[in-house]
Design a protein with these regions (language model features):
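Short beta-strand to alpha-helix junction loop
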Residues: 1-5, 112-117, 174-175
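Mid-domain beta-loop-alpha active-site segment that forms a flexible
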Residues: 1-9, 120-124, 179
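Short, hydrophobic alpha-helical segments
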Residues: 14, 38-39, 129, 183-191
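Short, well-ordered beta-to-alpha junction loops that form the rim of enzyme active sites
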Residues: 19-21, 47-48, 103, 167
Length: 204
């Protein structure tokens, strides 16, 4: 809901365009870049799993993509907004529903949710929950994790005026708001970047 609200506000001021990005349209322009009618000092790539799986035209090294799955369950009684964490998480969403996850796999990226991982998560619910439940949803996704488990934030090591904001695996994703604010402050006020997160560290 928050993202929808922010997106709507940006659209009102014509600061947001929803379209498929084409790297071939990006041009060097003076000390910055140009994309169609838009000009900027730099462009920030936030392509997530698309980069992690090598499906972006912008080559970014250092990823170790991880597949994860979650299920949504309907419980016999309400968990409220509580969270149970014992190997997997179980987060109450209100209305007798909860989200349970997440699994880890380093293959099967092209496949959807698997029966094996669904069973793993349902077994977990039976272990931590004293009551009946029914699975009502099952999803799979790709974490754009990085080999050293730190995000990739900073200038691209080879492409001028191209920056990277990626690598939010299962741990770094919790810090995404802080990391985004950190990058904004660098552009606005010149505050130093986090050296341990620079993409250049992954280039040998």
């Amino acid at each position: 809901k928050m993202l929808d609200a922010v997106r709507g506000k940006l659209k009102q001021g014509e600061h947001f365009s929803e379209e498929e990005f084409d790297w071939d349209r990006l041009e060097a322009h003076g000390d910055g870049v140009k994309y169609g009618a838009l000009g900027a000092h730099a462009i920030i790539s936030c392509e997530g799993a698309q980069s992690a799986l090598g499906e972006s035209k912008l080559e970014v090294t250092g990823f170790s993509a991880v597949k994860g799955e979650v299920i949504k369950v309907e419980l016999a009684h309400d968990l409220g907004k509580e969270c149970i964490h014992q190997g997997h998480f179980m987060i109450g969403e209100g209305g007798n529903r909860a989200l349970v996850g997440a699994t880890y796999a380093w293959d099967g990226f092209e496949e959807g949710p698997s029966a094996l991982k669904r069973q793993e998560l349902e077994d977990h619910v039976q272990k931590v929950w004293d009551g009946s439940f029914k699975t009502i949803g099952h999803k799979a996704g790709i974490r754009p994790a990085v080999k050293d488990r730190r995000p990739l934030i900073g200038p691209h090591p080879k492409e001028k005026n191209v920056w990277v904001f990626n690598g939010m695996g299962s741990r770094a994703v919790l810090m995404t708001p802080y990391l985004a604010q950190h990058l904004v402050e660098h552009f606005m006020y010149g505050s130093p970047l986090l050296e341990e997160c620079l993409p250049a560290r992954m280039v040998k």
